[in-house]
Amino acid sequence: MSLGLVGRKVGMTRIFTAEGDSIPVTVLDVSDNRVTQIKTVETDGYTAVQVAFGTRRASRVTKPLAGHLAKAGVQAGEILKEFQIDAAKAAELSSGAVIGVDLFEVGQKVDVQGTSIGKGYAGTIKRYNFSSGRASHGNSRSHNVPGSIGMAQDPGRVFPGKRMTGHMGDETVTVQNLEIARIDADRKLLLVKGAVPGAKGGKVFVTPAVKTRAVKGAK
């Protein structure tokens, strides 16, 4: 139950420390997270904040959503996202408020959720890193096949969960414990250490890390 930010993946680059070390980072644009609704236990049964990100023409918004946004005095966005928070945090926010990059700080660990790049229909070698068959020595037409998928007459079926060919990618993926390497407050950018799922321009959700790793040897 933590407040987060909705953003857009700009791409990857690298930054350098004072010692000259190169750090690969992903640049995230988290500008203009506008609060559209505060949900409370009394009105909705739980406590949450709904935010809008990006911009969208008014003509591309349904009338019910247009009324919802007009009530909050917020411009239409590309996406609406809800973050469940506690009542104390919800009391600090109001409809129409803007949540900025100051929500996070340099060195903080965050979880970033995005949609992985779709690969289409893929075989088991690409999808699950299976080994291919022999190129020769009697193998004529079984170079990239997965092999046997079942058993004999008993049990006479393919077990659920068997790794086979199928659609690969285009899934919701969360990368945990990424460190914020730098914050550009003027351009409203977060630079997180490491890779983030999705293609350039893809939507991402940034929240404080849930499973922070303990430092070995720390008391």
From Swiss-Prot:
HAMAP family: Ribosomal_uL3_B. GO terms for biological process: translation. One of its GO terms (molecular function) is rRNA binding. This is Large ribosomal subunit protein uL3. Belongs to the universal ribosomal protein uL3 family. One of the primary rRNA binding proteins, it binds directly near the 3'-end of the 23S rRNA, where it nucleates assembly of the 50S subunit. The modification N5-methylglutamine is found at Q153. Residues 133-145 have a biased composition (Polar residues). The keyword Lipid biosynthesis does not apply. GO terms for cellular component: cytosolic large ribosomal subunit. Part of the 50S ribosomal subunit. Forms a cluster with proteins L14 and L19. Keywords: Methylation, Ribonucleoprotein, Ribosomal protein, RNA-binding, rRNA-binding. It comes from Paraburkholderia phymatum (strain DSM 17167 / CIP 108236 / LMG 21445 / STM815) (Burkholderia phymatum).
